[in-house]
Amino acid sequence: MVNLVIVSHSSRLGEGVGELARQMLMSDSCKIAIAAGIDDPQNPIGTDAVKVMEAIESVADADHVLVMMDMGSALLSAETALELLAPEIAAKVRLCAAPLVEGTLAATVSAASGADIDKVIFDAMHALEAKREQLGLPSSDTEISDTCPAYDEEARSLAVVIKNRNGLHVRPASRLVYTLSTFNADMLLEKNGKCVTPESINQIALLQVRYNDTLRLIAKGPEAEEALIAFRQLAEDNFGETEEVAPPTLRPVPPVSGKAFYYQPVLCTVQAKSTLTVEEEQDRLRQAIDFTLLDLMTLTAKAEASGLDDIAAIFSGHHTLLDDPELLAAASELLQHEHCTAEYAWQQVLKELSQQYQQLDDEYLQARYIDVDDLLHRTLVHLTQTKEELPQFNSPTILLAENIYPSTVLQLDPAVVKGICLSAGSPVSHSALIARELGIGWICQQGEKLYAIQPEETLTLDVKTQRFNRQG
């Protein structure tokens, strides 16, 4: 049995969709709960994660609960609700990307017939097929399986085999974006039939281009030929990275000791409701992004001044990642539709991007979510005018945290910060790479046992075995 939850910004819309869906039911074989609008008579449009949680709980007496959402923060509220639910209930829940009205009606009919959760989702996702056919539009199945447009006589293409050991991660992808942006041509990058625009470093990353993958550039326009030549030269140069046949041999790192210090970045308070105009909020966001881009230029220069070219390339890549027109466009759309603050819109957009990275199955690319979180934090600091200063240490210290941003690690003094020990994190994150380059001991993914450590307790990190020892 599958029950449904409808999540909408508008109470009237949510109830209306629910009313339509119940017309499809001939029995109580599918329960429907509504979580729509917020309890504020003056500003009733919005979503509430607690409401979503309670709605799910009210229909959790089924094998699965399918959550249908309209847009924007409805998805974020649903994801937050999953974190609030008891694990045994959360395990039953699936979130559906289908259109709210047609998808809910199709899901209701399917669930009422006794279909399993996968069939219900399939029917919801294909709910627009009848309308497409009536309007003479191509099937969505065709679009999903072949997202690249058909070649025409003017379009040229060139395929290369990627020889970068870690694929097209942030640094080589940023080199690709920068290089192709200089040509007057319409371009697409294609891998296995899926196309993205080379203007967006984030779209390129989500293609998950790995070592030995074939990547094709399709170009059309006055400078198409020049773009293809530059693309080939980039590939031959491994997109600016040194070609390595095998992973580099890590230098042996001796155990490091110090006093435990729990580190947490400053928390930025994000208000959803805005008292400003949309244009004023857009200006605030652009200014905060500009300030963050200046921060990244400073970090790049700091690394270059220390002869750390690989680290400088990381923050140069961050600059490209942040300066992505699609991110600003998505945030501007939220500002238009939800009349929210710039920080709320930006948080929504970058959290969604961070989650997309976390869902990748390539460990190296997956770890880039930490870079996105770093950029979000830095921008929120500027938007909320929050003062942030790193703690100063006078004796050997081991930093303890759930995770730590790359920009934070670069600003640490390795003379006193001897090691970093995380409950989460990733051994292939840029934070880990920077720590190793600076000679700071690094262990991660230690889980809850990390929090048994007392502040000021003496710790020794064994980097080789990825374990810590408490010395009282």
Curated annotation (Swiss-Prot):
Where in the numbering of this chain does the HPr domain appear? Answer: 155-242
- Which pathway does the UniProt entry assign to this protein? Polyol metabolism; glycerol degradation
Chain segments carrying region PTS EI-like, N-terminal part = 264-472
Keyword annotations for this protein, in alphabetical order, are: Transferase
What top-level branch of life does the organism fall under? Bacteria
Keyword Transferase tagged: yes
| PTS EIIA type-4 domain sequence ranges | 1-135
Provide a Gene Ontology MF annotation, just one. Answer: phosphoenolpyruvate-glycerone phosphotransferase activity
> CDD domains attached here?
PTS-HPr_like
Provide the E.C. number(s) assigned to this enzyme.
2.7.1.121
InterPro entries found in the cross-reference section: DhaM (IPR039643), DhaM_N (IPR012844), HPr-like (IPR000032), HPr-like_sf (IPR035895), PEP-util_enz_mobile_dom (IPR008279), Phosphohistidine_dom_sf (IPR036637), PTS_EIIA_man-typ (IPR004701), PTS_EIIA_man-typ_sf (IPR036662)
Cellular component terms per the entry's GO annotation = cytosol; membrane; transferase complex
Please provide the Gene Ontology terms (biological process) for this protein.
Answer: carbohydrate phosphorylation; DNA damage response; glycerol catabolic process; phosphoenolpyruvate-dependent sugar phosphotransferase system; pyruvate metabolic process
Among the Pfam families in the record, one is PTS-HPr
> Is Transferase set as a keyword in this record?
yes
Family statement drawn from the similarity comment of this UniProt entry = Belongs to the PEP-utilizing enzyme family.
Q: What does this protein do?
A: Component of the dihydroxyacetone kinase complex, which is responsible for the phosphoenolpyruvate (PEP)-dependent phosphorylation of dihydroxyacetone. DhaM serves as the phosphoryl donor. Is phosphorylated by phosphoenolpyruvate in an EI- and HPr-dependent reaction, and a phosphorelay system on histidine residues finally leads to phosphoryl transfer to DhaL and dihydroxyacetone.
Q: How does the record describe its quaternary structure? A: Homodimer. The dihydroxyacetone kinase complex is composed of a homodimer of DhaM, a homodimer of DhaK and the subunit DhaL.
Supply any other comment. Unlike the carbohydrate-specific transporters of the PTS, the complex DhaKLM has no transport activity.
Q: What is said about the domains? A: Consists of three domains. The N-terminal dimerization domain has the same fold as the IIA domain of the mannose transporter of the bacterial phosphoenolpyruvate:sugar phosphotransferase system (PTS). The middle domain is similar to HPr and the C-terminus is similar to the N-terminal domain of enzyme I (EI) of the PTS. The IIA domain of DhaM (via phospho-His-9), instead of ATP, is the phosphoryl donor to dihydroxyacetone (Dha). The phosphoryl flow likely involves HPr ('His-15') -> DhaM (His-430 -> His-169 -> His-9) -> DhaL-ADP -> Dha.
Q: What is this protein called?
A: PEP-dependent dihydroxyacetone kinase, phosphoryl donor subunit DhaM
- Gene name tied to this protein: dhaM
